């Protein structure tokens, strides 16, 4: 995770060799409060969103 704003519910994932990927809290799987921490490693799929690539699942 490059950065994630838990108040606004979105951030960006740094992908080696590619552009950063947008992530919205609704794409985070799990129960309860959905938040990601800077530097956290995550697995995800890249889907095409309204404004370009974004993370899913």
UniProtKB/Swiss-Prot annotation:
Domain CSD stretches: 1-57
Main location per the UniProt record: cytoplasm
Signal sequence interval, chain numbering: none
InterPro entries reported for this sequence: Cold_shock_CspA, Cold_shock_domain, CSD, CSD_CS, CSP_DNA-bd, NA-bd_OB-fold
Domain of life the protein comes from: Bacteria
Protein induction: In response to low temperature.
GO cellular component terms, semicolon-separated: cytoplasm
Transcription recorded as keyword: yes
GO molecular function: DNA binding
UniProt keyword list: Activator, Cytoplasm, DNA-binding, Stress response, Transcription, Transcription regulation
Subcellular location per the Swiss-Prot or TrEMBL entry: Cytoplasm
Stated role: Affects cell viability at low temperatures.
Self-association state and partner proteins as the record states: Homodimer.
Protein name (record): Cold shock protein CspB
